[in-house]
Amino acid sequence: MAKTRSPSTPPAPERVAAFQTGISAETRAAAFLMAKGYRILARRFKTPYGEIDIVAQRRKLIAFVEVKARARLDDAAYALTPRQQQRIIAAAEAWLVANPDHATYELRFDAMLVAPKRLPQHLPAAFDASP
């Protein structure tokens, strides 16, 4: 007797809402960066080590940007944990391997804080890759 595959269960509504909020926040953050003169090189760059929300370039600078969306900007500021920072650094290294022509650029790890009805807040050099 052949097994029948049960239909996959849809994701929980709160997970769908969180995903949509994240996509919206990343779109707002990317638009804000472009208005500041950055060129978006990648969005949601996935690696086995982690994901980079936005990779942006301005002149000879590459910014790896983590976007944090919360109800309040203060809450967003505290949402970037040391473990996440390490995953972003590892993902940035993978991005540089895939994009070696940018290896000589200045590298920076930024954060973009996004809250409803507020302009995104860009935090250049929010953390560094030093051990």
Swiss-Prot record:
GO terms for molecular function: nucleic acid binding. Belongs to the UPF0102 family. SUPFAM superfamilies: Restriction endonuclease-like. InterPro entries: Restrct_endonuc-II-like, tRNA_endonuc-like_dom_sf, UPF0102_YraN-like. It comes from Rhodopseudomonas palustris (strain BisB5). This is UPF0102 protein RPD_0400. PANTHER family: UPF0102 PROTEIN YRAN. Transmembrane segments: none annotated.
